[in-house]
């Protein structure tokens, strides 16, 4: 009898979870991934499957390691049409074509939500000079500028107190320690950007000061979520990281 009751409870729970996902709005997303220095072949699956388990999403994944081929894809007219949101998990730091980069950011300025992960913060701005009196297009969209990073070391993620219950951070425990990490240097956080968490890789590491590692921004009409966390597959695969991404999708889509 006890076995039957336990089995009934398990089946009821699974049915409730299934019904919850069925009733959730389903999205269509594109992921732009590839480039230098990361295991993008595996990460594209970790990210897409992890998000889909939390927020029903149908995916088109553009995986290209060559910078010029990736640029050609994103230069096509209407490449983002038909997608509810775009995920950038790529690393093309040495793009020099400012007009190309602006064409991407314009997609989001008119309202397309975006999720930017790890080396997306180093992409599209290192080799482009800012026009006098203006910010670089890519970093303006992200809401912050980053160049360089510390050594491979676990990162303690400390939530900003006043935003500890932000919808994106609500499932992240205070002081979460990533399995591995590579703490990015964030030289400037722009006005209008809301930092949700700072990362600390220890007193004997560099950078010496905690760095912004999770934030949100609004670029024109488009909501942007960005995190510098995620160099290693071990970090991206954690429940905490994937919960954060699922929450981020819900947040960037809420305005729409």
Where are these regions (language model features)?
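Catalytic beta-strand/loop cores that center a nucleophilic Ser/Cys/Thr
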Residues: 52, 58-60, 71, 144, ...
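Boundary at the C-terminal end of the N-terminal hydrophobic targeting segment
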Residues: 16-18
């Amino acid at each position: 009898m006890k076995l039957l009751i336990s089995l009934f409870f398990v089946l009821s729970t699974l049915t409730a979870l299934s019904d919850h996902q069925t009733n959730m709005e389903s999205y269509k997303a594109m992921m732009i991934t590839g480039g230098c220095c990361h295991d993008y072949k595996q990460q594209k699956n970790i990210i897409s499957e992890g998000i889909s388990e939390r927020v029903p999403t149908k995916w088109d994944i553009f995986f290209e390691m060559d910078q010029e081929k990736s640029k050609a894809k994103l230069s096509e007219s209407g490449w983002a049409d038909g997608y509810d949101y775009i995920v950038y998990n790529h690393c093309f730091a040495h793009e020099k074509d400012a007009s190309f980069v602006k064409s991407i950011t314009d997609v989001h300025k008119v309202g397309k939500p975006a999720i930017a992960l790890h080396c997306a913060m180093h992409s599209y701005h290192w080799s482009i000079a800012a026009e006098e009196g203006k910010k670089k297009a890519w970093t303006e969209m992200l809401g912050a500028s980053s160049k360089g990073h510390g050594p491979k070391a676990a990162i303690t993620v400390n939530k900003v107190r006043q935003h500890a219950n932000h919808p994106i951070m609500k499932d992240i425990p205070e002081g979460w320690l990533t399995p591995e990490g590579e703490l990015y240097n964030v030289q400037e956080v722009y006005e209008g950007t809301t930092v949700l968490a700072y990362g600390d890789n220890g007193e004997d590491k560099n950078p010496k000061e905690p760095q912004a590692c999770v934030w949100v921004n609004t670029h024109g009409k488009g909501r942007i979520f960005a995190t510098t966390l995620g160099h290693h597959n071990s970090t991206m695969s954690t429940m905490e990281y994937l919960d954060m991404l699922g929450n981020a999708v819900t947040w960037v889509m809420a305005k729409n």
